Structures are given as C-alpha cells and as structure tokens.
From Swiss-Prot:
One of its GO terms (molecular function) is structural constituent of ribosome. GO terms for biological process: translation. It holds the Pfam family Ribosomal_S2. Gene3D superfamilies: Glucose-6-phosphate isomerase like protein, domain 1, Helix hairpin bin. PANTHER family: 30S RIBOSOMAL PROTEIN S2 PROKARYOTIC AND ORGANELLAR, SMALL RIBOSOMAL SUBUNIT PROTEIN US2M. Belongs to the universal ribosomal protein uS2 family. InterPro entries: Ribosomal_uS2 (IPR001865), Ribosomal_uS2_bac/mit/plastid (IPR005706), Ribosomal_uS2_CS (IPR018130), Ribosomal_uS2_flav_dom_sf (IPR023591). GO terms for cellular component: cytosolic small ribosomal subunit. SUPFAM superfamilies: Ribosomal protein S2. Keywords: Ribonucleoprotein, Ribosomal protein. The gene is rpsB. This is Small ribosomal subunit protein uS2. Transmembrane segments: none annotated.
Length: 250
C-alpha cells in the first residue's frame, strides 16, 4: 500500500489541465505551469494520497464498505478490475441519478436483476423467442447499469471518485447523505467538500491505474487486518477456557 514520488511522476499525476481552465481553489496544490499546462505539486499529492489510502484501510478494517466510481472512458475498465480485485461495489458505466439518495428504488432494481439471473440459469425455454429477446435486453441493461453494485445491500460508508467534476451528481448525493468522499481532483475542479482530496491528473490511464490500485490495495490490507484480528482474538480467547475434570460437582 505504498506509492512513491517516482511512480507518480511516471504515471503523469503532475500534469494538470490548460491554465485557462483552472479552478483557483486548486491554487494550494499547483507548483507552476509549463507550456500553458498547470503542474500539480506532487509534494502535496503524495502525502494526501497516502492519507486517503490509510483512511480506506482503516475503514475497511472496521468492516466499512467503499464504493469505487469511475465512468470516464479511460477509467472504466481499470476501476471495474480493481474493484473486483478488492471485492467492493463499483460504478463503471454511468451514474444513475438517485443511486444513493433513492437507494430504496435501486434495491428494487437489484432484486429484479438477481431474480432474472436465477430465471436465466433455470432456463428460458418457456418463453417465446420474442419474449427471450426482450428478457435478454432487459437483463443486459440492468447488468450494465447496476451490475457493479448488485451485492451492495446498504449505502456505502465512503465513496472513491476519479474526477469529481465529471461525477458531480455522485459527489452531490454523497454530500447530501453525509457519506465521506475520497476524490481525485484535477486543476480544473474544486476540492471543496471532498474529505480526502487527491490532487492529480484525472485523464491519464496510468494515473487512474495508480489511484485505483492504491485504494484497492488499501482495502485488501484493511480486510486482511480485520480477519487477522479475529483469528488473533479467537486464539487468545482459547486461553481463557478452564478444563473441568469429569465428574466434578458444581
């Protein structure tokens, strides 16, 4: 769960957007500019990313769930792969309005998807060809829209977002519900309201991989830590048992 300055440089984390598109609220995290492109200060980004990973690890160690969000073309496959590796829910195609604020309705759709999957496994021979086609189209749409959150039984305890501007609806919903946000913020967006800001390039696939892999590693370490604590507690608890001789009276 460690990232170095060199890794960030190689991933292009320091490359911001064109200076004319900058958000002044990102000024504390900008080192300067080169060829009209803002350069993000990695001496700020590195410790802030480490703080975000530490938080993700602690939250997961305490049985918390993190929802990973990345629906931009260059982030989709990376976010989905890392979320699956870490065993957490994710949104990689598009954010449906109300995914958090109207989670009760979303849960109904999740149940529908699971029921359809069970029906599909049992066989669709009883349906006509037209009905099978309609069925297939519906299940494909549900899988595309909510497949990544189908095992999410309750609201997440935190959300990790790549590009807070692109996912402003997700950010707004999380803020409204008081769900902590870990967000990658480029030079053209505001870090306000983001609990754990990661100042950096949100367009480069290499940078996106670095962020997603780091958070996924932290989640895995946190879960392993929690499992280790349980095993340790059971082992230590075994010392408390006192053997009672057979036939001993109360």
């Amino acid at each position: 769960m460690s990232t170095t300055m060199r890794e960030m440089l190689e991933a292009g984390v320091h490359f911001g957007h064109q200076t004319r598109f900058w958000n002044p609220k990102m000024a504390p995290f900008i080192f300067g500019h080169r060829n009209k492109i803002h350069i993000i200060n990695l001496e700020k980004s590195l410790p802030m990313f480490q703080d975000a990973m530490k938080y993700a690890k602690q939250l997961t160690a305490n049985r918390g769930t993190i929802l990973m969000v990345g629906t931009k073309r260059q982030a989709r496959e990376i976010v989905a792969a890392e979320a699956r590796r870490a065993g957490v829910p994710f949104v990689d195609t598009r954010w449906l309005g109300g995914m958090l604020t109207n989670f009760k309705t979303v849960k109904t759709s999740i149940k529908r998807l699971k029921d359809m999957k069970a029906q599909q496994e049992a066989g669709l021979d009883s349906l006509s060809k037209k009905e099978q086609l309609t069925f297939t189209r519906e299940i494909e749409k549900l899988e595309k829209d909510i497949g990544g959150i189908q095992d999410m039984t309750a609201l997440p305890d935190a959300i990790f977002v790549i590009d807070v501007g692109f996912h402003k609806i997700a950010v707004a919903e999380a803020k409204k519900l008081g769900i902590p946000l870990i967000g990658v913020v480029d030079s053209n967006h505001s870090p306000e309201g983001i609990d754990y800001v990661i100042p950096g390039n949100d367009d480069s696939s290499k940078a996106v991989t670095l962020y997603a892999r780091g958070i996924a590693d932290a989640i895995i370490e946190g879960r392993n830590s929690a499992t280790g604590d349980v095993v340790k507690a059971i082992a230590e608890g075994s010392d408390e048992f006192v053997e009672v001789e057979e036939g001993a009276s109360a």
